[in-house]
A protein has these predicted regions:
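Extended catalytic cores of very large enzyme megasubunits
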Residues: 1-562
C-alpha cells in the first residue's frame, strides 16, 4: 500500500488523502498493474503499489529536468491521463541506461544486415517495431554466400540486451559469409531469475538458442542469392519470438510488404499457425504507393477475407504523406508502428501518452486532460541518448520529437464521441499549442506531429475504459491473461481462487480467467455496424489526428460487400 514507508514519502500527495489500489482498482486492474508496471522494492520485500509506481515515474523526470510534476502525477494517480507505459515501467535505472525503453513505437526498413540486430535490441527494450520487407529495401541486402561450412568460431552471448543484440549481429555477419559458428550460452542467466534493473524474470538461454538455429536454417536455404521478403519477415518474427520475459512474449511488430508480393500476401493463409507459428508475432499489411487498379485491389481484398485473420491490412503510404501536418517534412517514405497509429521516418521513435475519456467528462475536462497528456509526452520526448543504435535513430527522433497524444474510452464518453468536427479540431489545435509551450520550456524542438488514437489494449484494462476508438467487447465476457508459473503473483491468484489452466503453447505459463462486466448502458461491438464504426474512425482521422487512429473493425458476414 502507498503509505508513509513509500520511497518518496507522504509529501508526494501534496496534502491529498492516501489511497490504495483496492479503493480505485478492481482485482483485474490491480493484476495489470502488478504484473506489467510495478517494480519490486527490495527494502520492503514487495512490489510497488500504484502510488509508488506513479511516484517513481514522476520522480525520475523531476530529478532529470529539475521540474515539479505534482499536477501530472495526480492526474496519472487518478487514472485521468496515462504516460508512456514503457516509461512508467522502466523509470529509474533501467530508463537511465536505455532511453529507447521509454518509447512505445519505432520503424525501420530491412535494408541493411544491421536491421536485424537493431530490431533485437529495440524489442528487448520493450519498444514495438514496425518493419518493411518491400523489395526496394530488401534488394539492398547483400547476397548470401554460395557455400556454407562449419567453423570453430564461437559466439559468446553476454547476458544483457546489448549482449544478445551483438550476438545476433555477429551471427548475421558470419552467415552472410558462409560460416556457421558455434555459440556459448553459459553466461545467460537461468530462466526465472529476477531481472533487478529492467524488471520481470529472465527467459533463460533456450529462446536465443532456438533463434540461432532458425537463423542458420534460413540462411543456408538462401545460399547463393539474396534473402527474399518472407525469409526476412520470418527472421524478424523469430527474433520477436526470442524476446520473452518470464515465459511470456513481450514483443510487438508489424510487417509492410509490396502489393504484388504473393509470398507475403499468403503468409497467414491455410494452417500457418501450426506450420509457421512464429508469424503470429507480426501483423501484416500491404503498403500502397499509388492507387491500385480495381482488379489488384479486389484480389487483395479477397485474400484478406479468405485469410479469416484480417490480413494483410492496408497501409497507403502516399495518403500518409498527404495527410501529415504542414509543419512536417513529408519527403520521407513513412512507415508505421505495430498498431499503425503513428507515422514514422525510417529509424525513428515515438512516445505515447493518453487521455482517459470518462462518461461524465465534458469538453472542458477533456481539454484539461489534453493539456496534461501533451506536457507529459513532451517531457518524455527529451529522452534521446540512445545506446547501441546507428546514428539515424537519434537524428530523426531529435528532429521530429514525435508525440502520440491519444484518446481512450471514446465510446464510453458522449462528450467526445458526439463532439462536432470543429470541437475535435479545437482540441487538436490545443494540443499543438501546449506542445509549443512545453517544448520552449524544455529547450527542445516542437513536435512534428502530436495527436492520434492508439488501440489502448493494456491501458484501457488498467483504467477500466473502452479501448481507444473501439466499443466494449460485450456486456459480459472472459478476459484471459498469461503469467509465468514461477511468478509469486501466479501463486497468489491460484490461492485467491482465480480460475486458471496451463498454457497449451507454453508449459511455463498459466492462463488466468477473469469474468468481466461492462458498465450499464455501455456501447458494445454488437451495437454498431462496420460502416458506422468506420465513419467514427474517419471523423477522428480528419479532425483530431495528426497521425491517425488505429482501429479493429468487427465485420459481420453480410457486411463484407457493403
Amino acid at each position: 500500500l502507498f503509505n508513509e514507508q513509500s520511497p518518496r514519502g507522504p509529501d508526494y500527495n501534496d496534502g491529498h488523502d492516501f489511497w490504495t489500489e483496492e479503493q480505485r482498482m478492481d482485482v483485474y486492474q490491480q493484476w495489470i498493474h502488478k504484473t506489467r508496471y510495478a517494480r519490486y522494492l527490495e527494502e520492503f520485500q514487495r512490489r510497488e503499489n500504484w502510488g509508488e509506481t506513479v511516484s517513481r515515474y514522476t520522480g525520475f523526470f523531476e530529478d532529470r529536468l529539475d521540474l515539479k510534476l505534482t499536477e501530472f502525477g495526480r492526474a496519472i494517480l487518478d487514472l485521468d491521463v496515462m504516460p508512456s507505459m514503457r516509461c512508467l515501467m522502466t523509470a529509474g535505472k533501467a530508463l537511465e541506461r536505455d532511453a529507447c525503453a521509454g518509447y512505445n513505437c519505432s520503424y525501420l526498413p530491412i535494408d541493411s544486415p544491421r536491421a536485424f540486430d537493431e530490431i533485437m535490441y529495440v524489442l528487448m527494450c520493450g519498444t514495438g517495431v514496425g518493419f518493411s520487407v518491400e523489395r526496394q529495401y530488401i534488394n539492398q541486402l547483400p547476397e548470401v554466400a554460395e557455400e556454407f561450412h562449419d567453423t570453430d568460431t564461437v559466439i559468446v552471448v553476454r547476458d544483457s540486451k546489448i549482449g544478445w543484440a551483438t550476438a545476433v549481429r555477429e551471427m548475421v555477419s558470419l552467415l552472410y559469409s558462409g560460416r556457421v559458428p558455434k555459440w556459448d550460452l553459459s553466461r545467460v542467466r537461468q530462466a526465472g531469475s529476477r531481472l533487478k534493473t529492467f524488471g520481470g524474470r529472465a527467459s533463460g538461454p533456450e529462446p536465443i538458442d532456438k533463434l540461432f538455429k532458425h537463423m542458420v536454417s534460413i540462411f543456408t536455404h538462401a545460399k547463393g542469392r539474396k534473402l527474399n521478403s518472407l525469409e526476412c519477415h520470418d527472421l524478424v518474427c523469430y527474433i520477436g519470438e526470442a524476446v520473452v520475459v518470464g515465459g511470456v512474449r513481450r514483443s510487438a511488430t508489424i510487417s509492410l510488404s509490396n502489393l504484388t508480393d504473393d509470398r507475403m500476401r499468403h503468409a497467414k493463409s491455410g494452417q500457418w499457425f501450426i506450420e509457421n507459428g512464429q508469424r503470429s508475432l507480426a501483423n501484416n499489411s500491404v503498403a500502397y504507393t499509388e492507387m491500385p487498379d480495381t482488379g489488384a485491389f479486389l484480389r487483395e481484398w479477397t485474400s484478406l477475407y479468405e485469410s479469416k485473420s484480417g490480413e494483410r491490412g492496408i497501409f497507403n503510404r502516399q495518403a500518409a504523406k498527404d495527410m501529415v501536418p504542414e509543419r512536417r517534412d513529408n519527403n520521407y517514405d513513412f512507415g508505421v508502428n505495430p498498431c499503425s497509429e503513428i507515422l514514422l521516418r525510417p529509424r525513428e521513435f515515438c512516445n505515447l501518452s493518453e487521455i482517459v475519456c470518462r462518461p461524465n467528462d465534458t469538453l472542458a475536462t477533456i481539454r484539461k486532460k489534453v493539456t496534461q497528456a501533451t506536457w507529459i509526452g513532451t517531457i518524455q520526448a527529451t529522452l534521446t541518448d540512445f545506446r547501441y543504435l546507428s546514428a539515424p535513430w537519434k537524428r530523426n527522433t531529435e528532429e521530429e520529437r514525435l508525440l502520440g497524444v491519444s484518446l481512450t474510452g471514446i465510446m464510453d464518453c458522449p462528450a467526445i464521441l458526439h463532439a462536432s468536427d470543429k470541437e475535435l479540431q479545437g482540441l487538436r489545435d490545443h494540443a499543438v499549442k501546449e506542445n509549443v509551450s512545453a517544448a520552449k520550456l524544455l529547450g527542445i524542438p516542437e513536435s512534428a506531429a502530436i495527436t492520434c488514437v492508439k488501440p489502448s489494449g493494456t491501458v484501457s484494462q488498467l483504467v477500466n475504459s473502452s479501448s481507444g476508438i473501439h466499443p466494449r467487447h460485450s456486456s459480459h465476457f472472459i478476459r484471459r491473461v498469461r503469467n509465468d508459473k514461477k511468478d509469486p503473483i501466479s501463486q497468489a491468484m491460484i490461492e485467491a481462487g482465480v480460475p486458471y489452466h496451463s498454457d497449451p503453447r507454453n508449459d511455463g505459463s498459466w492462463v488466468f480467467e477473469f469474468g468481466m462486466k461492462s458498465p450499464k448502458g455501455a456501447i458494445t461491438r454488437h451495437d454498431i455496424t462496420a460502416l458506422q464504426h468506420l465513419d467514427i474512425w474517419k471523423r477522428f482521422a480528419l479532425n483530431w489526428c495528426e497521425h491517425k487512429p488505429s482501429i479493429t473493425v468487427s465485420v459481420r458476414e453480410n457486411e463484407w460487400v457493403e
